[in-house]
């Protein structure tokens, strides 16, 4: 079943053709209007929760290097685990091609989409998903298959996104050697550690950020000099996720699992950008398989709900807010029909940015701006 999302400021549409000078000017004006509009948007969340509301955990699983296009290019787009989710966003834009800004965008997703520069500006706590959930009684948790030290990754989440939890540390089995020679933990072991420790936790409600970089380009098997190809690593991760979901279902624990990749791996590239390069965040890289699964609720419909239209992190934060507002876990089959839960989620026009490149869609065509220069049609 497909359910349309809500509204976003309309982007002009015409048949593709040679870009006109007036279009180039209009693209810049449209981008400025987009940023101004997004700055005022907010996700709606409850002011508080009743003692009668059914507690549940929220698990945000952030996966590096996995786009919709990567799944197709690797013949993994029909992997069985993808159909097990209750909700799938068909055109979710991660809005960047790099890990650091992707996590900042996810964790600041209770507001509209900021520019790349604004993302690193002054903190706005009203935009921080973990902070907003903290006011509702949610305790933070943090797990990774890496240390978070590379490129000051973890510290930026603390400084710019309201992450206060310490990393859960355990002696996990070694799975890969990272591109930077860091030891990377086995992802299934990390998932099982979360489940095991959650079962013994005294916290009534937790929100966990879990970040995996197993699919990052350059990772290799221990003792091997060459990088492990993308497809076997991706299949292994999807298989592990399938196993984890089986075990979580058997536990009966009430959990909202949100899978939201950071960006793609650029498995096959395009005419402009070679495979595995992500300097220009085009739609092949930034449209990622974002999915939601509810555990611990009996009699949910088997049919997967597809959210159509262009969406991004504001829709995800809004969905979490609607789940809380509806006390969705409080009734068998969910307190409201699943299609009502995703109805009218806010849409966001596809605009993506890195520090040196911006990409957007205008008149059914992708445009790119490099290093603050002139907007040009993207010929990929």
What does each of the following model-derived ranges do?
Residues 16-206, 211-220, 313, 333:
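Active-site-proximal alpha/beta segments of enzymes that process anionic O-linked groups
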Residues 1-54, 126-127, 131, 135-136, ...:
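Membrane-interface soluble catalytic domains
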Residues 214, 232, 242, 357-360:
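Polyampholytic, low-complexity intrinsically disordered segments
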Residues 77, 236-239, 315-319:
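Short amphipathic alpha-helical face segments that pack within enzyme cores
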Residues 115-120, 178-181, 225-234, 245-246, ...:
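Active-site rim elements
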Residues 81, 129-132, 236, 240-250:
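Catalytic-core regions built around general acid/base machinery
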Residues 253-254, 260-298:
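Histidine-centered active-site microenvironments of extracellular/periplasmic hydrolases
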């Amino acid at each position: 079943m497909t359910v349309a999302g809500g509204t976003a400021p309309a982007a002009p549409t015409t048949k593709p053709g040679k870009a006109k000078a007036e279009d180039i000017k209009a693209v810049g004006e449209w981008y400025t209007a987009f940023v101004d509009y997004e700055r005022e948007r907010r996700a709606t969340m409850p002011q508080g929760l009743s003692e009668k509301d059914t507690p549940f955990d929220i698990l945000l699983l952030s996966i590096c290097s996995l786009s919709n296009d990567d799944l197709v290019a690797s013949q993994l787009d029909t992997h069985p685990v993808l159909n097990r989710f209750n909700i799938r966003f068909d055109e979710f834009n991660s809005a960047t091609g790099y890990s650091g800004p992707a996590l900042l965008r996810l964790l600041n997703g209770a507001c509209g989409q900021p520019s790349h520069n604004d993302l690193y500006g002054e903190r706005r706590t009203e935009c921080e998903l973990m902070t907003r959930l903290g006011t509702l009684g949610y305790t933070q948790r943090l797990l990774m298959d890496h240390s978070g030290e590379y490129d000051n990754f973890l510290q930026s989440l603390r400084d710019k996104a309201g992450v206060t939890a310490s990393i859960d540390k355990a002696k996990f089995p070694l799975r890969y050697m990272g591109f930077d020679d860091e030891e990377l933990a086995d992802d299934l072991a990390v998932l099982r550690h979360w489940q095991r420790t959650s079962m013994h936790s005294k916290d009534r409600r937790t929100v966990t950020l879990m970040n995996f970089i197993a699919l990052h380009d350059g990772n290799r098997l221990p003792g091997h000099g060459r990088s492990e190809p993308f497809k076997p690593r991706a299949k292994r991760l999807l298989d592990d996720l399938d196993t984890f979901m089986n075990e979580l279902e058997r536990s009966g624990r009430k959990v909202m699992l949100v899978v939201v990749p950071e960006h793609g791996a650029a498995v096959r590239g395009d005419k402009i950008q070679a495979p595995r390069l992500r300097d220009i965040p085009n739609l092949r890289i930034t449209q990622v398989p974002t999915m939601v699964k509810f555990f611990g609720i009996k009699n949910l419909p088997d049919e997967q709900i597809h959210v159509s239209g262009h969406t991004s992190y504001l829709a995800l934060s809004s969905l979490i807010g609607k789940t809380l507002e509806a006390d969705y876990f409080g009734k068998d089959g969910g307190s409201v029909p699943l299609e009502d839960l995703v109805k009218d989620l806010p849409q966001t026009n596809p605009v993506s940015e890195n520090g040196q490149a911006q990409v957007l869609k205008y008149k059914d065509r992708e445009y790119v701006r490099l290093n603050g220069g002139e907007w040009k049609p993207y010929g990929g």
